[in-house]
Amino acid sequence: MKISVGKKVKDLAVISSDNKKMLSDYLNKNLILYFYPRDLTPGCTTESNEFNDSLNKIKRLGWNVVGVSRDTIKSHEKFINKYSFKFPLISDESEKVCKMFDVIKEKSLYGRKYMGIDRSTFLVNRELEVLNIWRNVKVKGH
């Protein structure tokens, strides 16, 4: 199933930095789910810090923030601790969440092609319905 605005996403088992077990465990509020390529890299750090800096305002508006990458929980814990993030990160080493949201894309770095995460953000309501999608976003001001 291709993810699009208005579609419902499946509830999936997840491995997260805050020990939540299912995607729906985050749905006590609406959810900002952002996918980023890699922990502790300049662009991903900037993006995550901007979410963290805006977190109080985001929560007052009724939203939770959760980041997703293919990094390990150990890597996520280092990332969270180094920058004092106040939101959880999902470890998607199996790519099941990434594939469901269709964020694994062919990329190129120094002429080498590889499959990586396309920086994307999804708004998902409490009923697991996708409200909005931003794909291939720029880091700054995201």
Language-model features: locations:
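Chalcogenol-based redox active-site neighborhoods
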Residues: 1-142
